[in-house]
Every structure is written in structure tokens, then in C-alpha cells.
A protein has these predicted regions:
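Positively charged n-region of N-terminal signal peptides that target proteins for export
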Residues: 1-4
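Eukaryotic scaffold repeat domains enriched in small/polar residues
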Residues: 22-391
Length: 391
């Protein structure tokens, strides 16, 4: 064990991680999870359904935040086979703009999927008449180092990132001046957020192909990245995450890869304080990243949401486990692309609770599903508990 630790230290301190194995060579195993069929209970008013459920975050096994891009009016009469979500009647929730109603955008459910809070006071904030391009909430997270457990929201309608009090009563902070832009005061379609122990916030700024950093008070600190496919360049950075030693992982979706960075005072790259230390190629559409103290999990789709809406997905989403050097450890696929239990068109965001249940948001079919470990599942094939745990 001591010898392995010494080798790892040398690799990291040299500024580059070991080259990962080819992702396509990774064996695809059987999912170690069972779906909880019908977990998320409908609560919309009569004639309405869940909309594009783009985001999920489990604060605890009994308190799970969900965000959707508005609800949808159901056809009248409702087609046979409706199971409480639009995908069950062949409607793509993320593109059915004509039936969208901006209500119940953020809500909270318990461990059995029952709605316990609806933050309707903020619905108007995210309203959009756009029928093309992004709108509404893209992802939600809680900073694990924040004892107040504020809910952070990537708002693509207003091109801002917001922090709400945990009970939803107060808007605590907003990053970005509002409206799309490319200077240090603006985002162009923020997609994700990640955090450091000192309260720093990283934001993936999709339209500007960059990562922006802010301090705990929301002041701009720095930025890096331009559109491209070179080292430290991005094409639609969809996910950003940090691990327990402060490394920064970026799901570079348009370039089909994950890039890894660290903060340093000895960077020889063009940025004086940020250094690219690894590129992990071989993905198709890395949409979300979950880093623990031991490994990194990545959700990899065969299509993004627009392509999935056009029926261009060629395989179900895949969960990929890598070690800290980017070496593939294990992977398994979601049950299918359909609307059956455990299936989904797109795995957009996922979250893991302290009991190692995981939750997956599918904005195309318009539902969030809960999965629990199969009896006897190996810890090598399942998610570790959040590390660091929420304060």
C-alpha cells in the first residue's frame, strides 16, 4: 500500500496523470442496481404532467431535490398507456414547447418519491418563451462544504447561477449580471457547478466554452478555456466536478472526453494558476461526473438531448467508473432507451445519497428514477458514498 501511494504521488506532482486505457476496451457489465419502479409520484394538477426533469440532487435519502423545465399540459383525452410521465405516451418532454407551463420548477421529494415541498415562489424566475435553445434549470447541486446546504441552480433562462436557502425561502446569491455575454460578469448558458473547501465555485459556461471561478462571496477570480479541441479547450463543457484533493474534472461533451485540471503556482501552461494534467478520451457524450475519495464515475450517453429527441441515440446511457489516473475500472448500461422501468432516453444528471442509492434525471422522457443496490452487489461495481459528505 505504501509503495502504491508513493508511485501515485510522483505521477501527480509531475503535473501529468498516467495515460488511461482505451475507453472502448472497457468491459460492460451488468448493472448492480435495481430500479424502484414508479418511485416518483405524480402531484401535478389535473391535466398536467412532469416536464423536462433535467436535474436531481440527493441531500439525504429522505430529501431529494428535483428541477424541471416546467410542467406540461396533457392531451385531451389522455392517450391510453399514460403512466404519469410524458415519455409513456410518446411525447418528448424537453421539446414539447407548445404544452409547457412554468410551474413547480423546483420541488423536493422524500425517500418514497412523495412531494414534500414545491418552491412555486420562484417559478416565474425561470419562465421562457424560447422554442429553440436552452431555457430553465440545467443542473442543481449543494456544496458539500456548506453547513447551510444552499441549493445552487444553473439557470439557462437568465444566464445566471443562483444560490437559494435550503428551505427555498431566500435567494442568497446570484452569479452573473443576467443576459448572455462573454466578459467576466456574464455567462452564456451556464450548465454546471462545482466547489472547493474554501467556498470557491467553478461554473461550466457552455456558450463561451470556458470554466469560470468565483470566490465564496461570488467575486470573479479567473477563467480558462476557449472553443476548440486542443489541450485546455472545450466544446460544450457539460459537467464540472471536484474531488477531495481539489482537482477539477470537466465533461467536455462536444469533444467526447473528460479533462482534468489542478490549481498550481507553477503552471507552464498559458494560465498561471491552472494546469491541465490529464485528458481522458473515448467517451461519446459525458454529461455528469461524480468524484469520490477513491474513483470517478461518469455518465456517458450516445447522444445529447437534441439528438435523443431526433431518435439518434444508438445505445443506452452507460455508467463508467475510473480510478484517479483515468484507468477504466468497470461500466454498465442503463436497461434501455425506452420508457420501461429503469430505461431512459438521456441520463442528464445523477446523484448518490449516503446509503449509496442513486437517482437519475431524464429530461426527454420527463421523469427521475431511483435505483438501489442489488443484494450482494460488489462495492467495486457500485457508487461510493459522497466524499466529502455534506456538512
Amino acid at each position: 500500500m505504501r509503495r502504491a501511494l508513493m508511485i501515485f504521488t510522483v505521477i501527480v506532482s509531475s503535473g501529468l496523470l498516467a495515460a488511461p486505457a482505451v475507453m472502448q476496451d472497457m468491459p460492460v457489465g451488468v448493472s448492480p442496481y435495481d430500479v424502484v419502479d414508479g418511485w416518483l409520484k405524480p402531484f401535478a394538477s389535473s391535466g398536467h404532467s412532469f416536464g423536462g426533469t433535467s436535474a436531481v440532487f440527493a441531500e439525504s435519502p429522505d430529501r431529494i431535490f428535483i428541477a424541471q423545465r416546467g410542467e406540461h399540459r396533457l392531451p385531451d383525452p389522455v392517450p391510453p398507456g399514460f403512466q404519469g410521465f410524458l415519455g409513456s405516451i410518446g411525447v418528448r418532454a424537453n421539446t414539447a414547447f407548445e404544452s409547457r407551463v412554468w410551474q413547480n420548477v423546483i420541488f423536493v421529494v422524500d425517500g418514497d418519491g412523495n412531494m414534500i415541498e414545491a418552491w412555486t415562489q420562484w417559478d416565474d424566475m425561470f419562465q421562457s418563451d424560447a422554442e429553440e435553445g436552452p431555457s430553465g434549470i440545467h443542473k442543481i447541486k449543494i456544496n458539500p462544504f456548506d453547513s447551510d446546504r444552499k441549493l445552487w441552480v444553473a439557470d439557462t433562462t437568465n444566464h445566471q447561477v443562483h444560490a437559494f436557502s435550503n428551505d427555498g425561502e431566500e435567494l442568497v446569491m446570484s452569479l452573473g449580471a443576467g443576459g448572455a455575454g462573454d466578459d467576466n460578469d456574464h455567462f452564456d448558458t451556464p450548465w454546471d457547478m462545482a466547489f472547493l473547501a474554501d467556498g470557491s465555485i467553478f461554473v461550466s459556461d457552455r456558450g463561451n466554452s470556458r470554466i469560470m471561478k468565483f470566490d465564496a462571496e461570488g467575486n470573479f477570480v479567473t477563467t480558462w478555456g476557449v472553443n476548440g479541441s486542443g489541450r485546455g479547450e472545450f466544446d460544450r463543457p457539460h459537467a464540472v466536478a471536484t474531488d477531495s484533493i481539489g482537482r477539477i474534472y470537466v465533461g467536455d461533451m462536444g469533444n467526447n472526453r473528460v479533462q482534468v485540471f489542478n490549481e498550481t503556482t507553477r503552471s507552464v501552461w498559458y494560465h498561471p494558476n491552472i494546469s491541465p494534467i490529464a485528458t481522458w478520451p473515448g467517451f461519446e457524450r459525458p454529461t455528469d461526473i461524480y468524484a469520490t475519495g477513491y474513483d470517478v464515475w461518469i455518465s456517458d450517453n450516445s447522444a445529447d438531448t437534441a439528438e435523443a429527441a431526433a431518435g439518434d441515440a444508438t445505445r443506452p446511457a452507460r455508467m463508467v467508473k475510473l480510478d484517479w489516473n483515468g484507468n477504466p475500472q468497470f461500466s454498465w448500461e442503463i436497461a434501455g432507451l425506452g420508457t420501461g422501468a429503469g430505461e431512459m432516453a438521456v441520463l442528464h444528471q445523477f446523484s448518490v445519497d449516503v446509503e449509496k442509492n442513486f437517482y437519475a434525471a431524464d429530461p426527454m422522457h420527463g421523469r427521475v428514477q431511483k435505483f438501489i443496490q442489488k443484494e450482494g452487489a460488489s462495492f467495486m461495481e457500485t457508487f461510493g458514498a459522497p466524499d466529502p459528505p455534506l456538512q
